Amino acid sequence: MAGWSCLVTGGGGFLGQRIICLLVEEKDLQEIRVLDKVFRPEVREEFSKLQSKIKLTLLEGDILDEQCLKGACQGTSVVIHTASVIDVRNAVPRETIMNVNVKGTQLLLEACVQASVPVFIHTSTIEVAGPNSYREIIQDGREEEHHESAWSSPYPYSKKLAEKAVLGANGWALKNGGTLYTCALRPMYIYGEGSPFLSAYMHGALNNNGILTNHCKFSRVNPVYVGNVAWAHILALRALRDPKKVPNIQGQFYYISDDTPHQSYDDLNYTLSKEWGFCLDSRMSLPISLQYWLAFLLEIVSFLLSPIYKYNPCFNRHLVTLSNSVFTFSYKKAQRDLGYEPLYTWEEAKQKTKEWIGSLVKQHKETLKTKIH
């Protein structure tokens, strides 16, 4: 197969970096373009280490900048679109989330048509499927069951619209007469080294004498390791570039999980961190129903204050539901169509994440020493 190139949007992020680390090993790949709003110095340093393997071009730009997207897509064979604003606490303005996640995706699809990019892989999220109620139990859910989020909260709503746009664009005619092939991947909650959520959670615990907050003990979910999600993107890319596999994959979405045990978010956090002296808060937590209605009251207060004051409650009904539902999904369709098998076992993923958390603990101790002296 002739030489090809790939654009990864949001490539400086948690998942994007892992995708790029796997991409460099792909056969006949001549260039990786990485588009992000800004690249942190440590990310630039990591990418510089890959320059000896492949041409790696870093592009700083806005997903809403049409000229930027046009230039980034020109001469590209594949687009992997991971860029998005992730916000479950409603801390980011709704307009910002809708613009980046929906309009940005639409503009990128249009840029692909103009630049005749034939393959588009979209990083969606499990949140486009729900959960809609903490009372509803979904175990080993499958794609054909058509679960769909009913939330109007900006993050799940915007990701749902973005995914629909991507799958709806499948089959579009490209400027050169070719055809655009698309698919979407819906990963579960992603954990692993560099996770911004896990990092914030652990830093919060470090500032609380190593006590982990206990707000998600009623959940039962199947988190997925970041390395396995990245691997699923590589397999989707290969499949959409294979004329024999395209007919079954184009316009489809896939749940991406792995063999991480089904457990609560609290249990996952504790398992990954207990080696470093962390412990779960032993205090009683509020019943879910009470948490839910308290969140509803806080949302009403936020709404009433909105004309004169911007008040963001520390939690909301969507977050309470997300954190306390039985909501697990199977990866059998990805296994069948993409040939997906987890690249990392649970033991490997657990060990790598534990070691990273250990490095956070070490950094925290060094910071405290510096403050004392």
Curated annotation (Swiss-Prot):
Tree of life domain: Eukaryota
Coiled-coil boundaries: none
SUPFAM superfamilies hit by this protein: NAD(P)-binding Rossmann-fold domains
Membrane disposition: Single-pass membrane protein
Record InterPro entries: 3Beta_OHSteriod_DH/Estase, Lipid_A_modif_metabolic_enz, NAD(P)-bd_dom_sf
Enzyme Commission number(s) from the entry: 1.1.1.145, 5.3.3.1
GO MF terms held by the record: 3-beta-hydroxy-Delta5-steroid dehydrogenase (NAD+) activity; oxidoreductase activity, acting on the CH-OH group of donors, NAD or NADP as acceptor; steroid Delta-isomerase activity
Membrane-spanning intervals of the chain: 288-308
Alphabetical list of Pfam families matching this protein: 3Beta_HSD
Reaction catalyzed: a 3beta-hydroxy-Delta(5)-steroid + NAD(+) = a 3-oxo-Delta(5)-steroid + NADH + H(+); a 3-oxo-Delta(5)-steroid = a 3-oxo-Delta(4)-steroid
Cellular component annotations (GO), alphabetically ordered: cytoplasm; intracellular membrane-bounded organelle; mitochondrial membrane; smooth endoplasmic reticulum membrane
Positions annotated as active site in the UniProt record: 155
Binding site for NAD(+): 159
Subcellular compartments: Endoplasmic reticulum membrane; Mitochondrion membrane
Gene Ontology terms: biological process: C21-steroid hormone metabolic process; steroid biosynthetic process
Pathway assigned to this chain's UniProt record: Lipid metabolism; steroid biosynthesis
Keywords: Endoplasmic reticulum, Isomerase, Membrane, Mitochondrion, Multifunctional enzyme, NAD, Oxidoreductase, Steroidogenesis, Transmembrane, Transmembrane helix
Chief location: endoplasmic reticulum
PANTHER family named in the record: BIFUNCTIONAL POLYMYXIN RESISTANCE PROTEIN ARNA, SHORT CHAIN DEHYDROGENASE_REDUCTASE FAMILY 42E, MEMBER 2
Function of the protein: 3-beta-HSD is a bifunctional enzyme, that catalyzes the oxidative conversion of Delta(5)-ene-3-beta-hydroxy steroid, and the oxidative conversion of ketosteroids. The 3-beta-HSD enzymatic system plays a crucial role in the biosynthesis of all classes of hormonal steroids.
Family listed: Belongs to the 3-beta-HSD family.
The name this protein goes by in its record: 3 beta-hydroxysteroid dehydrogenase/Delta 5-->4-isomerase
Origin species: Bos taurus
